[in-house]
Amino acid sequence: MKDSVIIVSGGMDSITLLYDKKDEIALGISFNYGSNHNEREIPFAKMHCERLGIKHITIDLGFMHQYFKSSLLEGADAIPVGHYADDNMKSTVVPFRNGIMLSIAIGIAESNNLKKVLIANHGGDHTIYPDCRPEFIKAIDEAAEAGTFVDVRVVAPYTNITKGEIAAIGKKLGIDYAETWSCYKGGEKHCGKCGTCVERKEALAEAGIEDTTEYEE
């Protein structure tokens, strides 16, 4: 039964969840909030939704670029290099980004009489992103249920697994991860050095997947 909305960025995790739950998904939603890499990743989200016959929409959140503070919104040169778990990667946090996106998706779900909102946060996000942590997901799920007539639920099945484990799921599903985008710098190729590029490399290696991503280095 197609009773779900998915927040789909075009990255490895959300594309895996898209294929993993494709039989349940009625609508894919991407958000353009003015980050360096939105223009690189959203086309992949749209492409995969179209491939699966799932309606896709992109919602503009340009106000976040104007009013929010994050290196992710300041241009490629502002993105730190290093491992995803390093403290310097905290500069890439867009404050309450998932909370805002989930709130909109919950409203869209209720407006379309859909019961669930899917999001692909994972265990590796917990160190850096407060709105990816289990306690946040639990709280917003309870708020969604309490705040909607149709008892919309937030479902985040990857919350306590690693990106490598997500890649292993994708491997079983036959996903070509070359058709996803990770790099926060948003250049013509993945930079190969920022936290998301490093994490991408590690996840693919952990899952035993040949990495055909084009990296600058």
Language model segments and positions:
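Residue-level recognition of conserved structural "scaffold" positions that shape functional pockets
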Residues: 17-18, 199, 215
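Short cysteine/histidine-rich metal-coordination sites, predominantly Zn2+-binding motifs
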Residues: 186-187, 207-217
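Glycine-rich nucleotide phosphate-binding loop and flanking beta-alpha elements
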Residues: 125, 204-205
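Local cysteine-cluster metal-coordination motifs and their immediate loop/turn environment
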Residues: 103, 179-202
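ATP-dependent adenylation/nucleotidyltransferase module used to activate substrates
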Residues: 1-174
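Short amphipathic alpha-helical interaction/hinge segments
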Residues: 148, 205-208
